[in-house]
């Protein structure tokens, strides 16, 4: 566990007194900064979520280091489920763009695929698999850049926590559901993309305890890796045109 204010390790974030399970707790103060080690212990999750939305580092420290037991490897199943939902939303929006392009070819599109049939419903699987691959390449590119810069200084980096930080900070993808319910312009997806990337910067900065400049470098490297992957797919099959956006 760590102090969410200064990031220093602490033995615990609260002490329980009275009967076990009574709910009577006293928050621990950090010996380094003399602030409450983790104020979010007593807060509802909606408050934590709002602070995530506001890019507050304390909220990321709480969720990554204090909310769940320490893991040497692997990531919790909850993160996997959330990631599947993210990819489903993103794939559906891409599919809608492809469908919109078929109806209005003169307008901008996310996907234009030169399939002979006019019904794109049975092609959703292709977009879904591509979205999975894009996210995987994005994460792997960030991991490679982190290894390149930090491996000599920190030979042991918990990359499972780095992946969790990226998934957690990609919560903005969940707002894509608004485009599924209401008729938002597709530019809304591009705004969400920028928001997600900025959230990734904050989460990586918190986990690695690094500078904002380095965190931006890691995210940009991941973004370029994703762009390169899309370019390779386009070169492999020239009948497919991809634009980097939601």
Swiss-Prot record:
InterPro entries: Arv1. It is a multi-pass membrane protein. GO terms for cellular component: cortical endoplasmic reticulum; endoplasmic reticulum membrane; Golgi apparatus; Golgi membrane. One of its GO terms (biological process) is sphingolipid metabolic process. Keywords: Endoplasmic reticulum, Glycoprotein, Golgi apparatus, Lipid metabolism, Lipid transport, Membrane, Sphingolipid metabolism, Transmembrane, Transmembrane helix, Transport. Glycans are attached at residue 34. It holds the Pfam family Arv1. The chain crosses the membrane at residues 73-93, 124-144, 162-182, 188-208, 216-236. It is found in: Endoplasmic reticulum membrane; Golgi apparatus membrane. Mediator of sterol homeostasis involved in sterol uptake, trafficking and distribution into membranes. Also regulates the sphingolipid metabolism. Belongs to the ARV1 family. This is Protein arv1 homolog. It comes from Dictyostelium discoideum (Social amoeba). The lineage of its organism: Eukaryota, Amoebozoa, Evosea, Eumycetozoa, Dictyostelia.
